[in-house]
Amino acid sequence: MSTEDNTNTSAQVHTTRIPVRWSDFDRFNHLNNVSYIEVAQEARTAFAQDEFAARGLPIPAVFVRRTEVDYFRPILPDTTAVEIDTTVVQIGTTSFTTHQSIKDRNGTVCCTVDCVQIAVDLATSSPRAITKHELGVLTQVADSAVINEATSADDPAETSADD
C-alpha cells in the first residue's frame, strides 16, 4: 500500500489518504481487521515524512509500545481509499501517543487507533528523551491541552504493561 495526497489540513490534524487493495478485504467483504492497523501505520509514516522530513529534520526512530483499536463499522469494497486523521494526544518524556480516525469513502469514522510510540536510541535499542526539535513538531499536531502538559505529563512509556 502506498500513500497519496498527504495534506496537513490544520495545525492540529494531519490527514492522509491511503489506497486500499482488493487483498485488504476478507471473505465477508469487509476490510480485514489487520488492514486497519496497516493503514494506520502507513498514515503514521506519512505523518513522520510530512511533519519531520519536510521540515528538514530527521525522522525520529520509534518503537510501538501499545496499539489500541476500536472498530465501529465495516469498511466495504466501495471505498477505494481511506482517509486517516492523525493527532498527537499525549507527549511524555520518552514517548508520545497518536490518535487516528480511519474514515470510509463517505467520511464516516469506522475505526480509531491509539498508538503509544517510544523514542529510541537505535545504537542501544533503549528509550531516549524526546528532543526539543521533536517536541516542537509534535506539539504542532497536538490537541491544545497536550501542548500545555507536554513538559510535565507522566510518560506513557513508564506506566505498567498491564494498563
What residues fall within each predicted segment?
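Terminal targeting signals and extreme-terminal segments of soluble enzymes
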Residues: 1-83, 89-163
